[in-house]
Every structure is written in structure tokens, then in C-alpha cells.
Amino acid sequence: MKILAYCVRPDEIDSFKNFSEKYGHTVDLIPDSFGPSVAHLAKGYDGISILGNDTCNREALEKIKDCGIKYLATRTAGVNNIDFDAAKEFGINVANVPAYSPNSVSEFTVGLALSLTRKIPFALKRVELNNFALGGLIGVELRNLTLGVIGTGRIGLKVIEGFSGFGMKKMIGYDIFENEKAKEYIEYKSLDEVYKEADIITLHAPLTDDNYHMIGKESIAKMKDGVFIINAARGALIDSEALIEGLKSGKIAGAALDSYEYEQGVFHNNKMNEIMKDDTLARLKSFPNVVITPHLGFYTDEAVSNMVEITLMNLQEFELKGTCKNQRVCK
């Protein structure tokens, strides 16, 4: 298959070279993010590959349909940037990478929890200013806390297994589909019970219409005073304005955000010499008890390699069978 890969980072190039040969593809790589303005570049190709922050709206999809594209493979698990109704209408087969490396995100999540509970980022900032005092840096021990995991699929299970080594006081979880393996470590509770009982709430659920802004004013009010919130999943699971109010009131002791609901166009881009136009993000950055990372929980050597390989496997399967096990929508 002849493939055009958009938004290719330097760290992906070797993987594309190696796996395109393995799976018999001809792949051209460009750094441009996919969107309506560059969709015309797909003319002459059979399929394209994109990333999670690319603009895959109706306009862009119609343009690649006019170019003859029938296959679109995103190198991510998340697909919230893709207009599935338009893809189906235009007969474009879409596939994603549902499990590239659950360990990458789970390990990062544990790191975020330690960063919050031991105030590591705040301590590092103070040391940069030659402030070596201990005042304000007292932390809490994980073994005295209850962990609440929302979403116990592949990543959530690995998160649970990771925290189990710290001897947490208790581990509870919520998922509409209970994981039998997770039951070896956690007790499943209702969502309200998780909000009420957990000292640390960590999110590992996909974004759906039903759970959009699940962490909002009402749910935060149900939480313990001094709760820690971690989001290494989808940004729009959290209502950012409600989060800010919770931080200002002291209800929330700290938040770690590896995803943010308005991250598109900001995360994974260098904005050092630009004025911050997003007032909400600027306010979140101003809190000493908020850790923000640019959606890099997935970002390990193994995960990057797997994301590229599985993407090319998906496209090969489309070519050979007309369908794909990781298919999300087709005509």
C-alpha cells in the first residue's frame, strides 16, 4: 500500500523505515499536522496515517475522499479528533492503536502521584531559586491513602498493579465493565462512592458523550477535602473551570494533568516565544500544586515503536482483507 504519514516526529522515522519494509508498504513521511489545508497532499496514496491532535474533521475527510483515500490509521488510541459520521459517509475505513504500551502510561501515572503527594515539582522550582528550606514541602505517604481508579481496562489495570506495590491503605475502582483481574487488587464501587472515599482519583477512561466533564462541580463537591486528581487519559473528562474552583477553595489538594481539554494546537508544540492565549491553561499553570505535562504519558521508546508498527499492520490488514481487527468505522 502507498501511504502518506502526517505529523511524523523525528523519533518515529526509524520505526517507519523498519516496519514499512517489514509489511511491504511504501510510506512517505511529512511533519505537517493533518487538516483541511494539507489534506490535498494525500492525492495518489491509498491510505494515510495521522496523530491524535490532528484535525480530522468533515472538511478534511471530504478532501481526502476526493483524493481517493479509503484507509485512515491513527497512531494513537484516542480517536476523539475524528469525525466518524463523516468518515462513514465518505467510505473511509478508520483504525486506531488500542494497546500500544499500557505500561508507559501506568508508570507515568504513578510518577505523577508521587510528584503531587511529595510536592516534587514545587521543590525543584524552589531549588532553582536557591531556596533549600523545607517549609511548605511536607508530603503524605501513599500507604496512608485510598486510591480510586476510574477506568480499569488495560491501562487502568496496570496502574492498579503499580500502586499495589506501595501498600496503599485501600484501592477501589469504577468501570461500567468490571475487570476480573482487577478484582484481585481492588474493590469495585459506585462512581459516587469512589468520589467520596478516595484520597487520590486517577482517570483512565475513554472519552464518551456520557462521561464528558465527569469531574465537574457536582462530582468535586462529593469528594474528600484535600483530594488529589490525576488525568492521564482524555482532557475533557475534567471541567477545567470546576477544577480551578476546587483548587482555589482548597477542596482539591493537587492535580496532575497529562491531558487537557483544550490541548489541541498547544500540546506537542513549542510555544516558548508566544503569549499564552488560553486563560484557563494560564491559570492552571499558576498553581504551585498543579503538575501539567504535554500529553507524554505514552511517550516511551517501546510505545512509539509499537504505535508505528500496529498502524502499518492495520493498513496491511485493510489491504489484504478489506477489514481490520482494530477498525473503528467503515462504509
Swiss-Prot record:
Keywords on record: NAD, Oxidoreductase, Phenylalanine catabolism, Tryptophan catabolism, Tyrosine catabolism
Gene this protein is translated from: fldH
Binding sites annotated in the UniProt record for NAD(+): R154, I155, D175, A205, P206, N211, A232, A233, R234, D258
The protein's name: Aromatic 2-oxoacid reductase
Pathway annotation from the record: Amino-acid degradation
Activity profile over pH: Optimum pH is 8.
EC top class, as a word: oxidoreductase
CDD domains (UniProt xref): HGDH_LDH_like
Function (record text): Essential for the reductive metabolism of L-phenylalanine, L-tyrosine and L-tryptophan. Catalyzes the conversion of phenylpyruvic acid to phenyllactic acid, 4-hydroxy-phenylpyruvic acid to 4-hydroxy-phenyllactic acid, and indolepyruvic acid to indolelactic acid.
Reactions listed under catalytic activity: (R)-3-phenyllactate + NAD(+) = 3-phenylpyruvate + NADH + H(+); (2R)-2-hydroxy-3-(4-hydroxyphenyl)propanoate + NAD(+) = 3-(4-hydroxyphenyl)pyruvate + NADH + H(+); 3-(indol-3-yl)lactate + NAD(+) = indole-3-pyruvate + NADH + H(+)
Record Pfam families: 2-Hacid_dh, 2-Hacid_dh_C
Annotated family: Belongs to the D-isomer specific 2-hydroxyacid dehydrogenase family.
Database matches in Gene3D superfamilies: NAD(P)-binding Rossmann-like Domain
Molecular function GO labels: D-lactate dehydrogenase activity; hydroxyphenylpyruvate reductase activity; indolelactate dehydrogenase (NAD+) activity; NAD binding; phenyllactate dehydrogenase (NAD+) activity
